[in-house]
Amino acid sequence: MLPQIMFSILNFAASRGFAEDSADSSAKQLARKAGVRGETYAYWYLRREGYIVIARNFTMPGIKGELDLVAYDGSILAFVEVKTRAKAEPGQPTPEDAINLEKRRNLARMARQFIRARRLENTPWRFDVLAIETTAGQKPIVRLHKSAFSEHRS
């Protein structure tokens, strides 16, 4: 019940836009705020979909990047990369396009470290991508791609 309520509240807030407009904020700060809000939205979205989130913003010393969300989808451990963008015009890159080969390799390294650190070597796992496109005044468009890529595919 709580995930449904929280998701409804976030849907309302998201319809007002993820990034706050401010004359004092740089584009980078606005993008960071939108990303944080997108990850919070994704957290509640996944909970509503039945995922059990066990880690947020996981980092390891010496490895570039972070795992946005780590969650169980049933018995499968899902490493979820969240990408939030303002709605793209036709022909423009989508949020999913931001996950290039280097990003996938970094995510795979982080995932292997997470699995080792938690002693989850016998647990099946995959990489999911949750893309969020926002337009002020409208509900976000959410696309969840299960098994979006593997560490062995480029």
For the regions a language model picked out, list residue spans one by one:
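Interdomain/boundary linker segments immediately adjacent to catalytic/signaling cores
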Residues: 1-40
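Residues at secondary-structure transition points
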Residues: 29, 33, 37, 64, ...
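Catalytic cores of nucleic-acid endonucleases
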Residues: 83-136
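Short, low-complexity, polybasic intrinsically disordered segments
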Residues: 133-154
